[in-house]
Each structure stands twice: as structure tokens, then as C-alpha cells.
């Protein structure tokens, strides 16, 4: 039986993932390279479910023979170990952040005659989009604190930038750098009364009244 490899990092399984697995199943036995918690935290976002929980879900999908950890966005270690006949991925990685990863996979597969299978990317759905929709419902201080603890646990560096108006909030929210196939972005924002005071031309002794502080926070919420 031919060997098929597909990488996934999801904790919300949707029909796009099922399409990928369904395509892969036609070519042989599927091994899923499931991104670890640390890999996901450094690439996309904090996972909602732990690696073991996500692994249990994927293992029970029809056609999946094995689930192995993928510690980075780079496929190299797992592909050299498994030497699959096929790697399956949606067409979305032909452009954007994963373009370089795709090129590297193609070169690697040439070493043993492997091929890439690229089913059409399922549009209008993604795990990130679904999670953002859930987050839009609201959050609590307890949830934010739990998320911060998990960030500190999983990431070697947690990137927090000070914000003091809507523009700086937008910078934190949208600034991204693609470095060696890995996305770098800010994890959160911090509102400093000291900087808020200085940005208003006042002494750097946090001399800003509560109404002004709330107005600043309202500006940030409105822009982000």
C-alpha cells in the first residue's frame, strides 16, 4: 500500500479537513502529521485542545492509519523518516506564508520520487475563522488570564506591545512577519498609563484622569 502524508494543526475539524483526508485516502494509507501545541502557538494561535486531545479526534477519522507529531511548520524531519509516496495539501499553500514550505517539500520528495497531491482548497471556512466567530461572542478576565498562562507555557517569548490609541492597537493586531516559513506576530497588547500620559504631553507620572483612560481604551476597542 502506498504511503500518504498530510499535515494538520486544527482543533476544530471541519469539512475542508475531511475533503483533504478523503482525497488522501484514495492514494493509500494516511499518516497525519499533527502540529504540536508549541508549533501551533508559534505559528497560528493557542490551540483550544491539547495535542493528545486533537490526536484522539484525528485517529478516529476514517482512513487515518497513524498520527505523528509535527514539531514545526517544516515537514523535513517527518518526510525523511516516513518517505511517503504522496504529500496531500490544499491549493492554498501555493501562495502566501506557506509558499516556501511547499517549494521545500517538492524538492525533498524528489529524493525518493514522491509526489504532491493538491485538492482544491475549501473556501469560506477555516478553523481560525470559526474560532474568531466564537471569540466574538465575548470573553472574561478568567479566560484571558488562562490564555496568557498558556502562552507563557508554550512560547519561549510572548510578544506584548504597549498601545495608547487606536492606531497602535491596529499595529499590534495586524503586524506580521514571515520568517523561514513561520509567522511572527504580537500575542497581546498592554495599555500603560505612563505612556498614555506622555503621549498627551503630560508629565510622565501617570497623570491621566480615569475618564481619559477609559476613552483611550474605548478607542482601542473600536479600532481592533
Q: What do these predicted regions represent?
A:
Residues 203-224:
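Alpha-helix-loop-beta-strand connector modules within alpha/beta enzyme cores
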Residues 1-143:
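Nucleotidyltransferase catalytic core that binds NTPs
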Residues 21, 55, 145, 166-169, ...:
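Generic structural signal for well-ordered alpha-helices
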Residues 172-198:
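N-terminal glycine-rich anion-binding loops that anchor highly charged ligand groups
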Amino acid at each position: 500500500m502506498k504511503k500518504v502524508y498530510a499535515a494538520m494543526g486544527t482543533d476544530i475539524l471541519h469539512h475542508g479537513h475531511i475533503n483533504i483526508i478523503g482525497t488522501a485516502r484514495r492514494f493509500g494509507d494516511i499518516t497525519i502529521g499533527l502540529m504540536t501545541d508549541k508549533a501551533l502557538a508559534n505559528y497560528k494561535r493557542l490551540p483550544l485542545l491539547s495535542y493528545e486531545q486533537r490526536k484522539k479526534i484525528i485517529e478516529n477519522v476514517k482512513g487515518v492509519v497513524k498520527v505523528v507529531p509535527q514539531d514545526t511548520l517544516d515537514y523535513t524531519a517527518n518526510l525523511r523518516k516516513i518517505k511517503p509516496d504522496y504529500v496531500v495539501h490544499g491549493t492554498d499553500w501555493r501562495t502566501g506564508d506557506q509558499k516556501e514550505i511547499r517549494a521545500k517539500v517538492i524538492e525533498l520528495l524528489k529524493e525518493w520520487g514522491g509526489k504532491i497531491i493538491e485538492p482544491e482548497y475549501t473556501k469560506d471556512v477555516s478553523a481560525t475563522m470559526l474560532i474568531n466567530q466564537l471569540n466574538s461572542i465575548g470573553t472574561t478576565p478568567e479566560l484571558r488570564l488562562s490564555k496568557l498562562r498558556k502562552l507563557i507555557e508554550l512560547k519561549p517569548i510572548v510578544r506584548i506591545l504597549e498601545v495608547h490609541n487606536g492606531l497602535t492597537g491596529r499595529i499590534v493586531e495586524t503586524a506580521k512577519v514571515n520568517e523561514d516559513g513561520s509567522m511572527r506576530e504580537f500575542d497581546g497588547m498592554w495599555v500603560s498609563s505612563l505612556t498614555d500620559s506622555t503621549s498627551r504631553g503630560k508629565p510622565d507620572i501617570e497623570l491621566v484622569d480615569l475618564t481619559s483612560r477609559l476613552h483611550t481604551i474605548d478607542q482601542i476597542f473600536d479600532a481592533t
